[in-house]
């Protein structure tokens, strides 16, 4: 893991950066027992001579009318029930174990969303989090970070009463609409990540570099995935047949190696400035962190406007000054 982290620090290889951000997300509290924030307050005991008092009626939380409370609950991953009697808990898991659980939960919610199934917090605990429930807030935060920065999605708590979550698009609609993948959001995010890596590299991206990024997301070339199926077939055949990618052998190299390039359809439907904005949004950086690519995107944007001034282009949030 340390070797990958070292490679990801290079800004020219920025498409591999989510791993470092995920492993060291600021503000993530590790091993904080839920009882520290979730236990219900206890009434003070009555003295031996105190007059009996009627217990106050329970007050229902007014979460439906308080958006801040909903947002805080989504970010904190509030547990569904207060813990029972305090018992000695297990030793805190290693950060790598929490990252692994976050990846498992990420694919779990993607599959649920793809099948139009409701994403319940109790189901997430039962099916994925399991014995790591004590650290569910950290796992949920890591999962939300990966979803936002890789797939352009937010994991949002939609009902505090039922603990129901939903995936919400985080990218601009005009950016996503230009990539015609039949509204298959996970595949759109995967394609944008590969196209971004190719663009940052300058000319093309070796297949080994692409798989280094996909391994960070828990994808393996030899292992079928619950969301993508055969991942290697998807990126080397399906995306190629749709003309989003080119997949070519590197000449004069033994043993044989392959590299990816932008396909003709990607060049028609996605501008370089959109890729720069995607990278800026994903990695929380200024586009000028990639100076040569940023200048190239500006030149393309000017050329497109000069060639067809009346054409409509998605509004850019990146300054050309």
From Swiss-Prot:
Gene name linked to the record: NDN
Ranges for domain MAGE: 98-297
Name of the featured protein: Necdin
Record-level Gene Ontology MF annotations: DNA binding; gamma-tubulin binding; promoter-specific chromatin binding
Recorded superkingdom: Eukaryota
Miscellaneous section: Located in the Prader-Willi syndrome (PWS) chromosome region. Prader-Willi syndrome is a contiguous gene syndrome resulting from deletion of the paternal copies of the imprinted SNRPN gene, the necdin gene, and possibly other genes within the chromosome region 15q11-q13.
One Pfam family cited in the UniProt record for this chain: MAGE
Function: Growth suppressor that facilitates the entry of the cell into cell cycle arrest. Functionally similar to the retinoblastoma protein it binds to and represses the activity of cell-cycle-promoting proteins such as SV40 large T antigen, adenovirus E1A, and the transcription factor E2F. Necdin also interacts with p53 and works in an additive manner to inhibit cell growth. Also functions as a transcription factor and directly binds to specific guanosine-rich DNA sequences.
Organism: Homo sapiens
Assembly description: Binds to the transactivation domains of E2F1 and p53. Binds also SV40 large T antigen and adenovirus E1A. Interacts with nucleobindin 1 and 2.
Gene3D superfamilies given in the database record: MAGE homology domain, winged helix WH1 motif, MAGE homology domain, winged helix WH2 motif
Primary localization class, coarse: other
